[in-house]
């Protein structure tokens, strides 16, 4: 759907961000090969979206993503910011940093790999400009990923929706758009090792959805390796649920019941003379079972305690290494509603 602004007055962009209304945040990590196609797609968006800026956040990428962006942005016709973080803090921290520094009044977030079609950004701003929603999320109708990846993703999100947060769409969420009010509420949640998608739905507000088909990756390789996926899964669970501790509690209660029952049975057997020699194997099995359960339980509790400790340190969620701005550019004549009409 083509984007249509709600007002028509001349607007000038200045380096301090005055005049920017629509900000697109793009986290960048190992996307050097995607940069040419990405910049070309953004040029097309810039022609369709008024008062538009793009905020690139290079999340400690080990390749030449930052250099490639700097070279390409020298010829960009839209307003832009290029932020480099001092190391890899994770995509969620990069997105937050981009939201914090964006100059607009409405915001959208997409990935740099172009697996989400860029026209989603126009859809997000169209819905936000209507004023009936505060948050718009992209919902995958289908995804062109390897079968194993699709199966594991479907299984994970189904379990997450069933056990932890039912509001999240069945296929999960990777991209979203929001207005100023929602952005301010989101930025107030200064939690380390949290789950950004969970925060979006935990906050509430008026939500809308835009359905799309996730495209196959044609350039480069995904940086979401097994270790990152595992950490992402742990953060998504421990940040929004006490389910692991509840399961541990029920396992402990069940183990206690079994132990008490076994005690009465063994005492009755011993008094009746059925047990002549104490068995080595049952004792060892019991010790190993309950010992491993104890260690497992301590690990679960430790995950929660560690997250509490991390949040008490008050360290910044990310550190900026460099921050560059695009030149002052004349944007399209269309303008958003006056500031007084925005949240």
Say what each PLM segment does.
Residues 2-145:
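Structured catalytic core of nucleotide-sugar glycosyltransferases
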Residues 2-21, 195-343:
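Hydrophobic helical membrane-anchoring modules
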Residues 29-33, 115, 119, 187, ...:
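Residues in soluble alpha-helical coiled-coils and helical-bundle/repeat scaffolds
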Residues 41, 54, 88-91, 106, ...:
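Residue-level recognition of specific faces of alpha-helices
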Residues 42, 98, 113, 136, ...:
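Residue-level signature of catalytic and energy-coupling elements of molecular machines
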Residues 47, 74, 100, 126, ...:
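Solvent-exposed polar/charged
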Residues 83-87, 91-101, 118-194, 215-234:
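Acceptor/aglycone-binding surface of glycosyltransferases and processive sugar-polymer synthases
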């Amino acid at each position: 759907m083509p984007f249509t602004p709600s007002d028509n007055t001349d607007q000038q962009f200045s380096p301090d961000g005055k005049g920017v209304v629509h900000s697109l945040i793009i986290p960048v990590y190992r996307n050097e090969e995607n940069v040419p196609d990405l910049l070309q797609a953004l040029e097309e968006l810039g022609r369709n979206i008024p008062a538009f800026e793009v905020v690139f956040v290079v999340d400690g990428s080990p390749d030449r993503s930052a250099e490639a962006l700097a070279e390409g942005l020298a010829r960009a016709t839209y307003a832009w910011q290029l932020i480099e973080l001092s190391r890899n803090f994770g995509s969620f921290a990069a997105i937050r940093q981009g939201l914090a520094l964006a100059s607009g009044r409405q915001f959208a977030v997409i990935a740099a790999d172009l697996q989400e079609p860029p026209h989603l950004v126009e859809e997000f701003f169209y819905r936000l400009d209507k004023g009936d929603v505060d948050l718009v999320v992209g919902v995958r109708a289908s995804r062109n990923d390897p079968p194993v990846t699709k199966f594991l993703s479907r299984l994970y999100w189904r379990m997450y929706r069933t056990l932890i947060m039912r509001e999240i769409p069945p296929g999960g969420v990777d991209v979203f758009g929001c207005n100023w009010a929602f952005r301010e509420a989101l930025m107030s949640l200064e939690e380390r090792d949290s789950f950004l998608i969970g925060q979006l739905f935990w906050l509430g507000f008026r939500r809308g959805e835009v359905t799309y088909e996730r495209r196959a990756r044609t350039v480069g390789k995904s940086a979401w390796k097994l270790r990152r996926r595992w950490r992402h899964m742990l953060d998504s669970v421990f940040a929004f649920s006490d389910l692991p501790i509840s399961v541990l509690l029920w396992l402990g209660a069940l183990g206690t019941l079994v132990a008490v029952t076994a005690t009465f049975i063994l005492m009755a057997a011993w008094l009746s003379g059925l047990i002549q020699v104490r068995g080595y194997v049952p004792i060892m099995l019991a010790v190993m079972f309950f010992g491993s359960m104890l260690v497992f339980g301590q690990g679960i509790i430790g995950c929660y305690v560690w997250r509490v400790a991390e949040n008490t340190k008050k360290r910044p969620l990310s550190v900026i290494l460099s921050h560059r701005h695009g030149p002052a550019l004349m944007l399209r004549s269309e303008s958003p509603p006056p500031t007084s009409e925005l949240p």
